[in-house]
């Protein structure tokens, strides 16, 4: 299908910010490259107008939003719910809620239409991890986790089955500062891949959420300085590539915008990274290939505030 578009910062949870100037070509170019590498150049991303029809001209019938909110209560105080009300998705997926189900903010009941709400959080770690799925339509079936005890202790996955697809929202484990959880992350990646492959063999799959990896160099601002940092190690990038191939799944944003640079979904709170757009693309909508004819658009709402991540939106014509 026709393509619609046209190349970092540090993994979340506080890894050090590194920048590296590009190769010098001339004095003027060198200054410009140095500024852009330091996050000071005009390397901003403008979300283009929403495309609400499929390649065949069918109008979009489903709108899904995903957002790592970095704590539900703080996100609500920062007016995150106002954005959701304006965006008006059919399904809303939230990650890093940091909130047990019995302590959910009452304001969540004010979301118009999103009355079917499902939550998962660690049973023994208040204020850590957690995901939510809110829907206008009642799913046929909802389950939690990936069926593997090692990986189902931290409230990271919700699966909702609908008539024509299965939706998985996930908050993938971070390899951590100093890569202290990289080995665990690799075990997770393998188990998650097998789980998703099983789901996708029965019904078309949509996977969304904070997948905690920038797949290619175009997906973060300073790739050279982050190859040994969580979110951009060779192991994590390889694991993501294997996920795409084995399930198989397509990265909806790169399918439509293969060469669009500076399109990020996460910015560390340090060093004014967001205002300089020194970011990472860690949040994704991945689709079964059979859903690509229904893909209308995959959006990065980079101007929406309320978290160190921004929301992303998917339009499908089902």
From Swiss-Prot:
Q: Please give the positions of the paired cysteines in each disulfide bond.
A: 65-93
The scientific name of the source species is Homo sapiens (Human)
Q: Which residues carry this modification: Phosphoserine?
A: 54
* Effect noted on mutating residue 70 to A: Strongly reduces AP endodeoxyribonuclease activity
Q: What is this protein called?
A: DNA repair nuclease/redox regulator APEX1
Sites of Phosphothreonine modification: 233
GO BP terms in the entry: base-excision repair; base-excision repair, gap-filling; cell redox homeostasis; DNA catabolic process; DNA recombination; DNA repair; positive regulation of gene expression via chromosomal CpG island demethylation; positive regulation of transcription by RNA polymerase II
Q: What induces it?
A: Up-regulated in presence of reactive oxygen species (ROS), like bleomycin, H(2)O(2) and phenazine methosulfate.
Name the encoding gene, please.
APEX1
């Amino acid at each position: 299908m026709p393509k619609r578009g046209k190349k970092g910062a540090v993994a979340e949870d506080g890894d050090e910010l590194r920048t590296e100037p590009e190769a010098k070509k001339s004095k003027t170019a060198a200054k410009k490259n140095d500024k852009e590498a330091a996050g000071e150049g005009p390397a901003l991303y403008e979300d283009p107008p929403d495309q609400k029809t499929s390649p065949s001209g069918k109008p979009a019938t489903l709108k899904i939003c995903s957002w790592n909110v970095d704590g539900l209560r703080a996100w609500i105080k920062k007016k995150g719910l106002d954005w959701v009300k304006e965006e008006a998705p059919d399904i809303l997926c939230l990650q890093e809620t940091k909130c047990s189900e019995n302590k959910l903010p009452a304001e969540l009941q004010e979301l118009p239409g999103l009355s079917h709400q499902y939550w998962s959080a660690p049973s023994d770690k208040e204020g850590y991890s957690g995901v939510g799925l809110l829907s206008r339509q009642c799913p046929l079936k909802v389950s939690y986790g990936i069926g593997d005890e090692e990986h189902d202790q931290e409230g990271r996955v919700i699966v909702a089955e609908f008539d024509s697809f299965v939706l998985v929202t996930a908050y993938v484990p971070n390899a951590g500062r100093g890569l202290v959880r990289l080995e665990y992350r690799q075990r997770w990646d393998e188990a998650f891949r097998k789980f998703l492959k099983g789901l996708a063999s029965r019904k078309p799959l949509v996977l969304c959420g904070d997948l905690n990896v920038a797949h290619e160099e175009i997906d973060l601002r300073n790739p050279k300085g982050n190859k040994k940092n969580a979110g951009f190690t060779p192991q994590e990038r390889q694991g993501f590539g294997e996920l795409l191939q084995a399930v198989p799944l397509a990265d909806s944003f790169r399918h439509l915008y293969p060469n669009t640079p500076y399109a990020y979904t996460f910015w560390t709170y340090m060093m004014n990274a967001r205002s300089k757009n020194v970011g990472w693309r860690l949040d994704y909508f991945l689709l079964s290939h059979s859903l690509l004819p229904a893909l209308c658009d995959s959006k990065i709402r980079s101007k929406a505030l309320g978290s160190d991540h921004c929301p992303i939106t998917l339009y499908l014509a089902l």
